[in-house]
Every structure is written in C-alpha cells, then in structure tokens.
C-alpha cells in the first residue's frame, strides 16, 4: 500500500501558504480594479468539452488528460485548463444575453495534466486566469495583456518580456495551412510520428512540437504574418498601436502558436528573462478565440483571455530573490504564570480575537519560561502575563517583545490600548 503523495503532486504546508495568499490577493485586486468578477467551475467536466474546445490534435487532449468513467458510464475529465470550462458556463447560463457586455471573469483554480514533473510544473497545478467574452475590439486584447503585466509589476517581477503574434482570421489561417502542408509534406519522414499525423490534421501544431523544435524545417516554415488578409493585418496593427500607447514593450514571434487549437488573431506570452531561470520560461500565455462559444452551442461571441501558472510564478519570485510579505504577525501571546490563571487566559484570548486582534496561548501546560520561548518563536508583538498578582489586582503585565518595555495595564483598558496601538501601526 502506497500512502505517500502521488507523483506530480505536492503538499502546501502552513509556512508556504502565505506565499499563495499573497499572489491570490494581488491577482484578485488587479482583476477587480479592471472590473473582472470571479467565476468558479467544477473540477471535472464531460471529456467531450475538452476534446472539442481544446482540440484533439493538441498534446493536452491526446496525451495529458486525466480521464475516467464514472459509475454511470460517463466519460469525465479533470480540467486541464480553464478557458473551456468558463466558456461552457457562459453558454450554459446564457450570459451572452446580459445587457452589460463584455462579460469579464477571472478564476484561480487547480488544473490537472499528466506531464513529466519538473521545476514549476506539476500534474496538479494551480492556474490563475481571466476571460473577456463579448468584444472583438483590439483594445480588449490590450486590456488583457495590460492586466497581466500589471499583476507582474505588483508582485515585483520586472525581468520579463512580452511576445506577441497574430494567427489571423479563418481565411488567413486556411491559406497559411496550405503553405505549411506544401512546405512540410516533401520532408515529413524527417519528423516524429505525431507530426506526421498532424500534417493533414492540423499542421500548425508541427510548429509547436517539443520533439522537433530544433528541426531547420520548422525554423524556415512559412510565416503566418505573410498570409494575413487586410482585415487581420489591420487588427494586428491596432493591437500594436494600443500597446505602444500604453508604453508596453513587445517583441513579435511569428512561430508562436500556443498549445491550444481555439486561438485566432492575437496570441501572446509573457516570459521571464531572469538570469538562471531558463531561457524563454513562459509565465503567462493567452490569446483571442472567436469560435469557442459557437462550438459549445452559443451564438458567435468573441473572447480573449490568459492563464498563469502559480507554481511557476513562485519559482520565478524565488529565482529573482523577491521576498514575499510575511503572514500576519501574532499580536498577543497570553502567558499564564500559574494554573489558576488558565480560565482568565481562555476568556482574554477569546475577547482579543473577537475584537480583531490575533492572539494565542499555551495549550501544553508548559512552564513560564517555555511559554515565553514559544511567544518568541511565534514572533509575538506583545505578551500579556497572568500571575497571582495580576489576578488579584486586575492589572496585567503587557510586554513589548521587541523593545522589552513592560507596563501594568488594567483589564478594562488593555483591549482599548491594544486596538489603539494596532491602529497606529
């Protein structure tokens, strides 16, 4: 019997959770400042949702999904990415009928992919992302990109670069597809078995192949930018114009197609350029999709979004030596100098907590010095000492653990004093 963690998963222990809270809080603040509202979707969906939405020619669907049959014989899959579920909810609940458009949502949820575990990549991972549904204006593309860049600025990640591309509209992609087939077909035997299948199914996926990434034929493949029609060129030019207006620097990479089949027009990645973190490590990726809502049974509705892997962001912060703010400090540790003070300690700690002051006491019946050491280990700002004299007089010893200053404060005023002190800080 194996009772240890499954490969590709991890426990987030209490001392680490504050780092996650920091990222979640900052992401929430930025999203809500941009008027995005949170959505929460099920951990598992019908398998067909991802086959149709993500694309059955992608690595995610063909290799990486956790799929199982339930007791009713239904094929279900743990969600491998966030967009398909959000769009499914958008269609199922007819959010496209809302008066206020676009519908702007964010999420922060666990995802599951059967991949080889490595730094910043697990089989269960957490993804933060946004989706804006209902606008085909290029300014919403730039808003989505701007939100991601603002989030990275807020958490201190500045050694990053934005890379963009355009996959054009359907007409542009069909012409590019024909050119790719003509380019690769005479040499298809030089590619992996998967790419040989992709040639006529979805040749764009060959550009994204991990095995054949260094093949010179990929480097010399026809560029999508040479096949953009007039409308697609104008759209991409507007995206670049808005980015320049916001003074967001960017590079263009015509080979960047992303790992999902639903993208069209704008795609982008935000990469770390932090020394020692690995070349072109992607921290955020996203793009525009116009056919997904219709694919799921809704009306033609354009969308734009991105996803960010939390584990990878934490690794990037560590590599950049960025200190995450510590968790909320323990404000008061109540020390009992004798057993008779225990009841008073319980009631005092409870009263402090009810008034918004974090408080703790000893639960192991330790001696006075051991309790004091415990207060130090927990970095308590103050200690309140309850002994025989304090119980008789109702005056408690309040000690500032940083300065060592100690004063007697009456039971009736100690709460007011602590609240006032907290307000000053």
Curated annotation (Swiss-Prot):
Cellular localization per UniProt: Cytoplasm
SUPFAM superfamilies assigned: Class II aaRS ABD-related, Class II aaRS and biotin synthetases
Reaction it catalyzes: tRNA(His) + L-histidine + ATP = L-histidyl-tRNA(His) + AMP + diphosphate + H(+)
Keywords recorded for this protein, A-Z: Aminoacyl-tRNA synthetase, ATP-binding, Cytoplasm, Ligase, Nucleotide-binding, Protein biosynthesis
Enzyme Commission no: 6.1.1.21
Annotated GO CC locations: cytoplasm
Highest taxon, organism lineage: Bacteria
Family that this chain belongs to: Belongs to the class-II aminoacyl-tRNA synthetase family.
Subunit and interaction comment: Homodimer.
Protein name: Histidine--tRNA ligase
Organism annotation: Listeria monocytogenes serotype 4b (strain F2365)
Gene: hisS
